[in-house]
C-alpha cells in the first residue's frame, strides 16, 4: 500500500510580497481655500507620520480616510503656511490657508542655478523632506499622494523589487521610456539610486512639471525632472543626530484557500455538471479519510500558502549623521543601515536560509572647502553596500505555483520512520512527477548577491566678479563604480509517488 518510486526532477523558486498595512476607518472630507475664499487645487493633505495622503481637486475639495480620531491632518501648499489639525470627532474639516511671505524668499534650485521662489515662473513643486520619513527603506514608496500631477504605484511588495513607478503629469509616450529625469546634487541617477536615499540626508526635494521648468534639460526632461539636493555641513560645533526605526510588514490582502474536503466536493460537483455519467475523481473513501485526518501520507490536506508564507515580518533601519565645521571647511557625514526581510518560512530541515534578507549600508560624506574668498570646492562621496539573500526565482512564478497546487494530491513530503532508509527528504508528487510541489521548489536552494555602488563628485565654483558683477564659473566632475558578486546554490529535489492508495 504506499511506497515510493519514480524519482523525478523539478525546478521552481520563491520570493514574496511584503506591504505595509494601513488601516482606514474614518472618512474625512472638506475644502481648502485661501483667505479670500478662493479654492486651492493641489494642496497636499497627509495623515501625520504616514504615507496616507491625497491632494485637493480643482475646486479645493478632498476626501481622506484616517485610522483614529486622534490622527493629525497636515495641510501644505507652496506659498502658504502649513497647518496641522486634529480630527477629533469631525467628519468635515474645512481649512483656510494663510500666505507665507517667507516662502517666497526661499531659494529654489532651477537647473544650473538657484533663484528665489517669487521669481520662478515654471511649475515646480517641493516636498518637505520630513514628509518622506515613513516606515520604509525605499524612498520611492514615500512619493505617493505627496503632490498633484504625480502618479505613483507599486507593482510588487517584494523586498528589493518594490521600487515605485511614477509619472509626472501622466504618461507622455507609449513607445519609449516614461520615467522622469532624476538628479541628485546635479548628477543623473537611476530610480534605484533614488530608492536607496535616506530621507535624513535630503535638504530639498523638488519636482519640475512643465515645459518652462524643464526647458534647460531639453528632451531628457520631457517626462518631468526630480531634483534632490543633499545636506551640507554648517559652521559651528559638531551636531550628532541618530534615528532608529522598527516597522511591521504584512500582506494587505491574502487569498482564502479551500480545505481539501471542500475542494474535492466542489470538484466532483463541477464534474457532474459537465457530464453526469462520468466517474468522479474523488471517491467517498478519499473524502472521508481526508475529513477525519487519517494518515497524511495517504490522505494529504495541504494549505500550500500557509506552508510557505508567514503572516508578517519585522524590518529595521538606523541612521547616524554628524555635521559641523569652521570658517574654511564644513562637513556632513552620514552612516545608515537597514534590514528588510520577506515572508518565506525557513524550514528546519534545511541548513540554509532561503527567505529574502536584505542588509544595506549607506555612507555619505559632503565636504565644502573655501580655498579663497572667490574660490570654493565641494567634495561629495556616496557609497552603498548591499547583501541580498533569497531564492532565485520570481515571486510571480512561485505564487502562481501555490495558486495551482492541488491540496489533496500529495503531501509536501512523506513522513516515515527513519525516512525509509533514505538520507534525503521524500518530496511528494503524483503520476509521472510533473505536478508542481511549491514547497520543494521553495526549499531547494538560495542565492547570495553582494553589490557595491560608489559615486564620487568634485565641484569647483569660481567667482568672476572682476570680469562682470554676478558672473560665476562652476565645474563638476564625477566617477561612478559598480561591483557585483553572486553565488547560487541549489539541489535537485527527489520526488516520490505513492503507487497504491486506499481511496
What do the PLM-derived regions correspond to, one by one?
Residues 243-247, 336-338, 382-384, 461, ...:
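Outer-membrane beta-barrel pore domains and translocons
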Residues 497-503:
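Cationic, amphipathic, low-complexity alpha-helical segments enriched
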Residues 233-238, 327-328, 374, 463-473, ...:
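Short loop/turn motifs that connect adjacent beta-strands in outer-membrane beta-barrel proteins
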Residues 439-441:
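Surface-exposed, low-complexity/disordered Ser/Thr/Gly/Pro/Asn-rich loops and linkers
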Residues 2-11, 20-364, 376-377, 430:
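Short, small/polar-rich motifs associated with maturation and membrane association
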Residues 251-253, 296-336, 340-344, 354-435, ...:
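Flexible loop and strand-edge segments within Gram-negative outer membrane beta-barrel domains
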